[in-house]
A protein has these predicted regions:
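Short, small-residue-biased leader/transition segments that mark boundaries at the very start
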Residues: 1-5
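ATP-dependent phospho-/nucleotidyl transfer catalytic cores
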Residues: 8-82, 184
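ATP/Mg2+ or Mg2+-diphosphate-binding catalytic cores
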Residues: 29, 165-216
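Catalytic-loop of the protein kinase fold
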Residues: 82-84, 89
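Catalytic activation segment of kinase domains across protein kinase-like and atypical kinase folds
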Residues: 90-116
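Active-site activation/catalytic loop segments of kinase-like enzymes and analogous catalytic loops
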Residues: 113-146, 159-179
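Helix N-cap / loop-to-helix initiation motif
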Residues: 147-151
Length: 216
């Protein structure tokens, strides 16, 4: 499975994370303004507006923290590392010879720890941010790649960003706002309701040890 996917075209640089967050934050504010201006609001719009202040404040805090993050400053300008771009369990295959990764369409030079953050967020959302699951993931990362305090702080910062909330608002505004599926409403409620559990998990993450493979 080593040749499951061979990239033929040149790999493009990922959009800088700070620029991406700036764009997301502007989009969230724009969608909120649109919803607020509507006279007749749907259940989705009312609920999204109710959750907005907390999520937007968090998004702005993350942007500020990231601009001062040491790990990001050290790695954001490097292009020698390649990110998968969509590293989750759907793109992993368990074979007789070990674990294989597939689907490299989004691969690009970038901060490699973002793959870990993406994978961890997907798993933790499915498990309602259970601390025990997070400990297993973090220990597995430390055992395989080594870990440092700077990496842990970067990971916490990335996981803090309300990316799922932004995604739902973005889908809403791009769907011409004419019809919101029940599935979207369920996802929005889940994101808002899980925020307390997510906060507790992120607080607990700050106490995680760096394992035996500690890096400087």
């Amino acid at each position: 499975l080593g040749d499951v996917y061979k990239r033929q075209e040149p790999v493009l640089l990922q959009q800088p994370l700070l620029s991406r967050y700036d764009k997301h934050n502007r989009e969230m504010k724009h969608v909120y303004g649109y919803m607020r201006g509507k006279k007749k609001k749907t259940e989705f719009e009312r609920y999204a507006m109710q959750c907005f202040p907390n999520f937007y404040e968090r998004a702005m805090q993350v942007r500020s923290q990231l601009s001062e993050n040491l790990y990001y400053k050290e790695h954001s300008g490097q292009t020698k590392d390649v990110c998968h771009g969509e590293y989750n369990y759907h793109n992993l295959l368990l074979t007789k010879s070990g674990l294989a990764t597939t689907n490299f369409e989004h691969a690009a030079p970038g901060v490699q720890l973002l793959d870990m953050a993406y994978f961890m967020r997907k798993v933790m959302e499915k498990n309602k941010w259970q601390v025990e699951k997070g400990v297993v993931l973090w220990n597995g990362y430390c055992e395989g790649a080594g870990c440092s305090k700077k990496e842990l702080e970067f990971l916490i910062t990335i996981l803090s960003y309300p990316i799922k909330y932004w995604k739902l608002l973005n889908q809403y505004i791009n769907s011409k706002k004419t019809w919101i599926s029940n599935k979207s409403m369920e996802k929005l409620k889940a994101v808002c309701e899980q925020e307390e559990s997510k906060d507790k998990f992120l607080q607990q993450m700050r106490t995680f040890t760096l394992g035996t493979s500690q890096k400087a």
